[in-house]
Regions:
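Solvent-exposed beta-hairpin/edge-strand motifs
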Residues: 145-173, 269-274
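C-terminal motif of bacterial Sec signal peptides marking the signal peptidase cleavage site
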Residues: 17-20
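Extended, low-hydrophobicity, Ser/Thr/Pro/Gly-biased non-transmembrane segments
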Residues: 204-311
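N-terminal, polar/Ser/Thr-rich
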Residues: 23-34, 46-49, 54-129
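Juxtacatalytic substrate-recognition/specificity segment
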Residues: 266, 297-300, 317-411, 415-424, ...
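A surface-exposed beta-strand-loop module
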Residues: 157-223
Length: 557
């Protein structure tokens, strides 16, 4: 059996546990045996969602070890884009991305950074050129002398390029340098930015992707099989921790981008024969007085509070949609996979319905699933958008089902409730993996739910018996050959053990409380533990330490 766990996104890369890299008929994390193709959509009752105003749970932000800068490199000059950038972020428009009960969440907009991006897509040249304007707020308790941005496409795993030019702070040109072979951009401020103050940062950027490169590079930054995926195509402001900017070298193992919630207002010019799939929702198309060049379509998107802004352009794909609890779910797939495409819609809809009932309501108006050429991994999540490996659509096994369920769960555990995906990936991956079990329970499919749990047991026990057990709560770069077994399988089993200790009603009350407390924010393992203990009124420290912070033998549930 191949255990596929991607090092670049969220789901199963094939070289971690076995030699060779041939995606199998398995799916999810870990992949399941081929056990049929049930598309049953009846669901069992879940605990009713409580709307209790929970008391605050103590939290602490993790410290990030400092990283010495590499020799700086001045970035090249880029011509400015002709696409207009709005002068002020329209906060009222952001409500279009949120379901009405969550529009009040925008009252907290002053604590989020604001991105305004206007860009032109050229699918032939494989480039995105644009201008980014940001409103950056110093939410720390010390002045900022500089700002740091991640240029993720310059990471070797992306296989692309992202360069910037004409960087200005409050309309004043400023010096910039790059570090870590161009992956990190330093923007020196003309004067320190005091705590609580804001600065306007503008820059031009140019992104370049490869074509048909999913076998050798990151499939989510690549044009292939009718999908031009443009993950992290823009400069992303780094997070600021208690001890400074997050300047850690990015590990290839696990999710690369570690980002904070922000508001995005994005205007894109695209050739008329390409269709856009993005985070958020479209609010304008070819508005009078703001028309694009001939042969292009100009569209404006707003995100609502989101952890990232994902962009893809598609050509020649079919689509199907349905509504679930007010959210429009849309799937995109190649025409020759119509039956599987329709099945993917049923899976995504059932996943959303089940997790809404058990975790708390998804606050956004749209969710999209795209069949894509990923090759090295089976699925990857972005806020509101999920990419699924194309070969799963040709399978009659459980792979498509578990992969989509896993990625939909990430909309809660990663996108809405964030964590340090490079430093403590187990927190979102463990919950997303255990959600595969919960998904099958929502179908009343006890056989498949038990099979998922058994896969987690098999993977973890195989590693433990081989002497490869270890601490789960550690940076991705610290794992050596046991990332799958610990971050996915052992972590999923921890949440199963937690559920057994708490009981179903209290377990789901804990997850709802965790979601309510940290929605749009970031949590640590300690935050999660404190929330669980506050919900059950019990001491869970020993259970947590045994499974997560140490490598002592545990009773596998």
């Amino acid at each position: 059996m191949h255990y596929l766990l991607r090092p670049l996104a969220c789901l199963l890369l094939c070289t971690l546990l076995l030699t060779g890299c041939v995606p199998t008929d398995s799916g999810g994390v870990p992949p399941s045996q081929v056990l049929g193709t049930s598309t049953q959509t009846d669901r069992v009752a879940a605990p009713a969602l409580k709307t209790t105003a929970w008391p605050a749970v103590p939290s602490a932000r993790p410290a990030i070890p400092s990283t010495p800068p590499a020799a700086p490199t001045v970035v090249p000059t880029i011509p400015p884009t002709s696409t207009p950038v709005p002068a002020v972020l329209d906060l009222s428009a952001q409500a279009a991305a949120l379901l009405p009960p969550f529009a009040a969440d925008l009252a907290g907009a002053e604590v989020w950074d604001h991105y305004q991006i206007s860009a032109t897509l050229d699918p032939t040249a494989l480039t995105v050129s644009g201008t980014q304007r940001m409103l950056v707020r110093n939410g720390a308790d010390v002045p900022f002398a500089a700002l740091y941005f991640h240029l993720y496409p310059n990471h070797p795993d992306f296989g692309g390029e992202l360069s910037v030019a004409d960087v200005r702070v409050n309309d004043q040109p400023v010096p910039v340098t790059t570090e870590q072979d161009g992956v990190l951009l330093r923007v020196d401020l003309p004067q320190p930015l005091a705590p609580g103050q804001q600065a306007r940062v503008t820059m031009n950027f140019l992104a370049y992707t490869q074509r048909n490169a999913s076998g050798s590079a990151y499939g989510a930054f690549n044009q292939e099989a009718g999908v031009w995926s443009l993950a992290s195509f823009y400069p992303v402001l780094a997070r600021y921790f208690a001890d400074g900017w997050d300047r850690r070298p990015v590990s290839s193992r696990g999710d690369l981008a570690v980002t904070e919630t922000a508001l995005y207002d994005v205007t894109l010019d695209t050739p008329v024969d390409w269709q856009l799939v993005t985070t958020g929702t479209q609010v304008e198309t070819n508005s009078p007085g703001n028309l694009p060049p001939e042969g292009y379509r100009r569209e404006r998107f707003v995100s609502g509070p989101q952890r990232d802004f994902f962009l893809a352009a598609i050509n020649g794909l079919n689509q199907a949609s349905t509504d679930v609890d007010g959210t429009r779910v849309t799937v995109y797939y190649r025409p020759e996979y119509d039956a599987a495409g329709q099945r993917s819609l049923a899976i995504a809809a059932q996943s959303l319905r089940a997790f809404n009932a058990r975790y708390g309501p998804y606050p956004l108006t749209e969710m999209e699933v795209v069949q894509a050429a990923l090759t090295k991994f089976l699925g990857v999540e972005y806020p509101g958008v999920m990419l699924i490996e194309q070969r799963l659509y040709a399978s009659n096994g459980r792979g498509l089902e578990t992969t989509i369920a896993h990625e939909v769960a990430h909309q809660w555990w990663y996108s809405l409730v964030g964590n340090d995906y490079q430093g403590a990936a187990w927190l979102d991956e463990g919950l997303a993996s255990y959600s595969q079990v919960i998904y099958y329970e929502s179908l009343g499919d006890a056989v498949s739910a038990a099979a998922e749990l058994q896969q987690f047991r098999n993977i973890y026990l195989s590693a433990r018996n081989a002497g490869n057990d270890g601490v789960v709560n550690r940076p991705n770069a610290a794992f050596q050959g046991n990332y799958v077994a610990l971050v996915y399988a052992k972590s999923a089993l921890f949440f199963h053990a937690l559920r057994q200790r708490m009981g179903d009603e209290t377990f789901y009350a804990f997850l709802q409380r965790y979601y309510e407390t940290y929605r749009y924010g970031e949590a640590t393992g300690s935050d999660m533990l404190a929330t669980a203990e506050a919900t059950c009124g019990c001491d869970l420290q020993a259970l947590y330490d045994a499974w997560i912070t140490s490598a002592v033998p545990v009773d596998v549930p």
